[in-house]
């Protein structure tokens, strides 16, 4: 069992910030275009469907963790045994690392496209790795503190969005239901990876005091993030025509260009720099989860694992040289996310639920 000393644990209310910090990141800047490809401006319904699925999955996760009284590593070892369980654990550790790399590389690309076109991918990635090393090596409570601070970046994002509202044309959303239900489901599937991150709680559970009391805060954190994604989608749909949106990679950043302030010429510079608060929390959490999982599987020092992961991040970032490579990497990560989170977790839930019912009926028979 994963036992954590109380001095390293956090209060249940902070789970709100952890879920939001992991879930709301770089994906929101461009996912409106992605879902519009599948269902046009009915794509917002796909966001609602994904949001509802997330709340259901969080409930399943709490059920699983309560039955195990440990984290994901303990759960899979109990269900499948040490060897097979560790195979699944390694898969999840790799998945969390992939998520972290995808967020880092996406943010580096945004900096290069919008701010410094000649900036070195290696140097920008190295800087982000050094920042994350300092935060993660300081402990989980510091990571939680960063997630709390990142709310400031989210509020800044909302503040800028209010300036864009006066340029919105809400009749763009009409008529609704112009696409088939299968198209809407496709848009829901395409929004999954951008809205993922809540699964981080599978590793966080032992670090929370009275973890079952944090369930409502986890649901509220997910609700806050889901509403932000829905708001961002509707805002992008109302601001751009459908043809314009399909040609705009980072819709949310493009919208800031219409905001005019007398003392700032390039507001997107401020927006991207400020949004770093949000981005940092969305890549240090999966990186920490991957490090923690690897530590519990192989029983090696966490600092050594973290340094090794930074080398992997630097190498992979260098290999992703253009938008096509980055997009393929993220698309493949999204497929892995779908199968691990939206397929595997419900299957695991069913197995544990059936096992629990069987044990209960067996006990009553005796």
List each language-model region with its residue ranges.
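Selective recognition of specific alpha-helical transmembrane segments in multi-pass small-molecule
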Residues: 49-60, 96-103, 131-132, 151-165, ...
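Membrane-interface interhelical connector segments
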Residues: 239-268
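Membrane-interface loop-to-helix entry segments
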Residues: 107, 122-123, 135-162, 333-346
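Membrane-water interface regions at transmembrane-helix termini and the short interhelical loops
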Residues: 37, 106-112, 128-150, 207-210, ...
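Membrane-interface "cap" regions at the ends of multi-pass membrane proteins
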Residues: 1-31, 39-41, 207, 351-366
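Hydrophobic alpha-helical segments and their helix-loop junctions in multi-pass secondary transporters
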Residues: 97-100, 104, 136, 152-177, ...
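Hydrophobic, membrane-embedded alpha-helices of multi-pass small-molecule transporters
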Residues: 10-30, 46, 54, 92-96, ...
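Membrane helical hairpin/interfacial module
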Residues: 28-121
């Amino acid at each position: 069992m994963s036992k954590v000393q109380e001095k390293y644990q956090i209060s249940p209310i902070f789970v709100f910030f952890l879920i939001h910090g992991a879930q709301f990141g770089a994906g929101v800047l461009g996912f409106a275009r992605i879902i519009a490809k599948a269902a046009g401006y009915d794509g917002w319904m796909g966001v609602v469907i994904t949001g509802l699925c997330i709340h259901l999955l969080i409930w399943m996760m709490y059920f699983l963790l309560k039955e195990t009284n440990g984290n994901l590593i303990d759960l899979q070892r109990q269900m499948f045994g040490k060897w097979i369980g560790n195979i699944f654990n390694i898969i999840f550790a790799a998945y969390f690392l992939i998520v972290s790399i995808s967020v880092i590389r996406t943010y580096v690309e945004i900096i290069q496209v919008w701010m410094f076109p000649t900036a070195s991918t290696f140097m920008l990635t190295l800087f982000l790795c050094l920042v994350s090393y300092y935060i993660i090596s300081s402990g989980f409570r510091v990571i939680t503190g960063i997630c709390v601070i990142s709310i400031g970046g989210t509020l800044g994002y909302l503040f800028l969005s209010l300036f864009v509202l006066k340029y919105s044309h809400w009749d763009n959303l009409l008529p609704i239901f112009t696409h088939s239900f299968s198209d809407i489901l496709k848009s829901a599937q395409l929004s999954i990876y951008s809205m993922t991150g809540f699964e981080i709680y599978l590793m966080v559970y032992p670090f929370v005091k009275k973890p079952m009391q944090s369930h409502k805060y986890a649901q509220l954190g997910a609700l806050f993030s889901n509403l932000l994604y829905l708001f961002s989608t509707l805002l992008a749909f109302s601001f751009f025509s459908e043809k314009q949106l399909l040609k705009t990679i980072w819709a949310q950043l493009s919208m800031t260009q219409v905001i005019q302030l007398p003392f700032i010429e390039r507001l997107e510079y401020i927006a991207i720099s400020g949004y770093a608060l949000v981005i940092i929390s969305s890549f240090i959490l999966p990186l920490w989860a991957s490090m923690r999982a690897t530590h519990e599987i192989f029983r090696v020092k966490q600092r050594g694992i973290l340094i090794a992961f930074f080398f992997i991040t630097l190498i992979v970032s260098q290999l992703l040289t253009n938008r096509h490579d980055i997009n393929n990497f993220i698309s493949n990560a999204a497929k892995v996310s779908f199968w691990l989170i939206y397929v595997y977790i419900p299957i695991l839930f069913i197995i544990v639920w059936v096992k629990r019912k069987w044990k209960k009926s067996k006990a009553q028979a005796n």
